[in-house]
Regions:
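Conserved beta-strand-loop surface patch within small alpha/beta domains used
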Residues: 1-89, 97-150
Length: 150
């Protein structure tokens, strides 16, 4: 989703099970960064699809394989044809195992402009974690409200 000053920042809705899966993936892969794809509709995340982290240094970076990305695009097309749905890959997620859920310069540079991004910060507080959603707005990656739905 690309937003401009002519539109307001969106709320992003996420299914509770998808969010639970993302948190479990982040904890399981620590101290490496985890990563995955978000499937749903614009502004609505229905499913989190874990992918392997192909970065050369997975403790500091993440890289989603193009093979994983295109496999999910094909899967969404099959679902859409079979069920008359409009599912798509709408975003990506990754973790910062020792940090806050703030996008790094690399995160911003490599981000797809039409995606929603979730970052899980496992080091956000003592014993805790924080998740933030981001979308591009006037070509800047901006935080947006993340609403958990059942």
């Amino acid at each position: 989703m690309r937003w401009s000053s002519r539109s307001r920042l969106p709320d992003v809705r996420i299914d509770r099970e998808a969010l639970t899966a993302i948190v479990a993936h982040a904890r399981r892969d620590a101290p490496n960064e985890c990563c995955g794809l978000l499937v749903g509709r614009p502004g609505e995340i229905l499913e989190a699809v874990p992918t392997s982290n192909g970065a050369t240094d997975p403790t500091r970076r993440y890289e989603i394989s193009p093979i994983d990305y295109f496999a999910q695009i094909r899967r969404c097309r099959r679902i859409n044809e079979a069920q008359s749905e409009r599912f798509a890959v709408v975003g990506a997620y990754h973790s910062h195992p020792r940090g806050d859920p703030e996008p790094s310069e690399t995160d911003v540079e490599q981000a797809f402009r039409d995606f929603v991004f979730l970052i899980v910060g496992l080091g956000a507080s003592i014993g805790g974690m924080e998740i933030r959603a981001y979308c591009f707005y006037d070509d800047r990656l901006m935080p947006v409200p993340l609403i958990v739905v059942d």
